[in-house]
Amino acid sequence: MSRDLVTIPRDVWNDIQGYIDSLERENDSLKNQLMEADEYVAELEEKLNGTS
């Protein structure tokens, strides 16, 4: 399998990197929200089961 090389202008590359960075930050934020939601659900389950 051969690979073709493509030249990407520096400003386009920087834009792509910036977009990737913003996606990584958004992903981290969503992971944190999910962990908080999991903790909240666990607390609700404890209350529902009368173990709190």
Swiss-Prot record:
- Keywords annotated in UniProt: Host-virus interaction, Inhibition of host innate immune response by virus, Viral immunoevasion
Q: Does the keyword NADP apply?
A: no
Q: Name one GO biological process term.
A: symbiont-mediated suppression of host innate immune response
Role summary: Plays a role in the inhibition of the host RecBCD complex (also called exonuclease V). A double mutation in this protein and the nucleotide kinase gp1.7 protein allows phage to overcome the retron Ec48 bacteriophage defense system. Overexpression of the wild-type gp5.9 protein in E.coli with an intact Ec48 retron leads to a dramatic decrease in cell counts consistent with cell death, the L23P mutant does not have this effect.
Give the protein's recorded name.
Probable RecBCD inhibitor gp5.9
The species is: Escherichia phage T7 (Bacteriophage T7)
Species classification: Viruses, Duplodnaviria, Heunggongvirae, Uroviricota, Caudoviricetes
